[in-house]
Amino acid sequence: MMKIAVAITGASGSIYAKIVLQQLQAMKAQVEEVAIVWSDNAKTVWQHELGNSDFESLSFKSFDKNDFMAPFASGSSSYGALVICPCSMGTLGRIAGGISNDLITRAADVMLKERRKLVCVVRETPYNLIHLRNMAAVTEAGGIVCPATPSFYSRPQSLEDAARTVTDRALQLCGLDVKGYKWGES
């Protein structure tokens, strides 16, 4: 059983966050606890992109982005993974630079220093050189950069199916057993 934190930033791609949360809700056999932290703009972007505020009915505990008393803000907690989905390039840059100025970046720093899973689902295109260097720095520090790039060999039939190819991969990278399409497996 894993405790997992989900950070949602204001980057475009709220559909990814919504699907991650739906998937985690369905993984009760693998996931003991889920905590959510929202950046300043995350809920605004969610409402703009998805046209709703479904996030208000989530059964997970939400933490304020300035709540450094949240359990996953400390290495002594038993949280095993943090997935930042979507991860803005600003957030990635602060993580790469070791700047822990809010709960999202502090939790990322904890995951790196404790050698736990940090998965950053970046959603930006095109990348500039600063983005690439920040992705390299986070990777070198032990994080995993998982671009929000859907795969199409599973022949997704909807936008949600395409987005799920990204979220399946992100949750697999966190160490969860996801029952999604896998190349060469029936």
Positions of the model-derived regions?
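A cross-family phosphate/adenosyl-ligand binding-site feature
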Residues: 2-119, 123-186
